[in-house]
Amino acid sequence: MAVKERIGTVVSDKMEKTVVVAVESRFPHPIYQKTVSRTTRYKAHDEDNTCRVGDRVRITETRPMSRQKRWAIAEVLSHSPKAAAEEANKAEAQEVKQ
């Protein structure tokens, strides 16, 4: 059986070691043939708390880790520019304090 993978965007990182990833799927409507986009939200395990809101990530299906969490972060494809700027500002603030 193949390992299921999805690519999506982190929309929430407020939980400890867990992020919510939104995956958008597009398909034609069966009757009207208009392209419909549907967003599915997955709770994914983030062991090191490295993901931030806006990051593009690849998630893979794994064993159940809790009642709703059955996916894990495989890799961070790209960091959001906002999160990268915030981390740079934090680093500068720490340098100024020292």
Swiss-Prot record:
Belongs to the universal ribosomal protein uS17 family. This is Small ribosomal subunit protein uS17. The gene is rpsQ. Keywords: Ribonucleoprotein, Ribosomal protein, RNA-binding, rRNA-binding. InterPro entries: NA-bd_OB-fold (IPR012340), Ribosomal_uS17 (IPR000266), Ribosomal_uS17_bact/chlr (IPR019984). One of the primary rRNA binding proteins, it binds specifically to the 5'-end of 16S ribosomal RNA. NCBIfam families: PRK05610.1, uS17_bact. It comes from Synechococcus sp. (strain CC9605). SUPFAM superfamilies: Nucleic acid-binding proteins. Transmembrane segments: none annotated. The keyword Magnesium does not apply. PANTHER family: 40S RIBOSOMAL PROTEIN S11 FAMILY MEMBER (PTHR10744), SMALL RIBOSOMAL SUBUNIT PROTEIN US17M (PTHR10744:SF1). Part of the 30S ribosomal subunit.
